[in-house]
Amino acid sequence: IIESVGEGVTDVAPGDHVLPVFTGECKECAHCKSAESNMCDLLRINTDRGVMIGDGKSRFSINGKPIYHFVGTSTFSEYTVMHVGCVAKINPQAPLDKVCVLSCGISTGLGASINVAKPPKGSTVAVFGLGAVGLAAAEGARIAGASRIIGVDLNPSRFEEARKFGCTEFVNPKDHNKPVQEVLAEMTNGGVDRSVECTGNINAMIQAFECVHDGWGVAVLVGVPHKDAEFKTHPMNFLNERTLKGTFFGNYKPRTDLPNVVELYMKKELEVEKFITHSVPFAEINKAFDLMA
């Protein structure tokens, strides 16, 4: 909830309900003016900045020593100071303890399916990695109308939970003596229509691309790989009209689009509650990290 605003801020006011976002939307740069991009020149994620853009200084300190901002949001605190371009004003009726999860990973996976993969109704989608982002990608495929959603994960204990998010079938690569892209091709008469990769493992990224059907298949990469990783595939995979795409924050523009994602929840089209397994008081934040391990 906005407590106060700085000079010149007109888009939000004290009392407004907002979602803080690690990336932003200045609404002035070429990316913000493009209907295709959310990679704001001014406010895109910068993990090294640690200060406010306007004056290059931190707004936090302890015993006179500065504490630097964390990914532009510093939300591991009860009060924070942010650039107005990194807060999305939302419906004040939306429960903040639920829709807060839309500030990062859930929107990333959801948008990867809905905005980037864009599976046609009745299509088949493979989701690689069934962590929170992957489950959100499955949820996005469900909302889009995919009829088969195949979860791919090395941890079979995740499969039952993934059914709640629309997954209809599962593949554990360890159960097969052939590449998983071949397994998926055999299951789907030549390949899936769409795939969404949510692990960041370079081998899974390649598999996610090579498992899509020639002629119309689209693979979307969400996971962040190791900085030295190299994506290698045969050029014929492209010449046979497979498409490879990347995405950042589900292609959502934070200020423009997140209010609409919240409305999906308010209209009961997006089921946020099933992403939440525990609630802990702020004083036990480290316990929350332990629960995610």
Curated annotation (Swiss-Prot):
It is found in: Cytoplasm. It is an enzyme of class 1 (oxidoreductase). GO terms for biological process: formaldehyde catabolic process. SUPFAM superfamilies: GroES-like (SSF50129), NAD(P)-binding Rossmann-fold domains (SSF51735). One of its GO terms (molecular function) is zinc ion binding. Gene3D superfamilies: Medium-chain alcohol dehydrogenases, catalytic domain, NAD(P)-binding Rossmann-like Domain. Keywords: Cytoplasm, Metal-binding, NAD, Oxidoreductase, Zinc. Zn(2+) 1 binds at residue 104. Binds 2 Zn(2+) ions per subunit. InterPro entries: ADH-like_C (IPR013149), ADH-like_N (IPR013154), GroES-like_sf (IPR011032), NAD(P)-bd_dom_sf (IPR036291). One of its GO terms (cellular component) is cytosol. It comes from the Eukaryota. Its cofactor is Zn(2+). Coiled coil: none annotated. Its main location: cytoplasm. Zn(2+) 2 binds at residues 26, 29, 32, 40. Homodimer. Belongs to the zinc-containing alcohol dehydrogenase family. This is Alcohol dehydrogenase 1. It comes from Zea luxurians (Guatemalan teosinte). The lineage of its organism: Eukaryota, Viridiplantae, Streptophyta, Embryophyta, Tracheophyta.
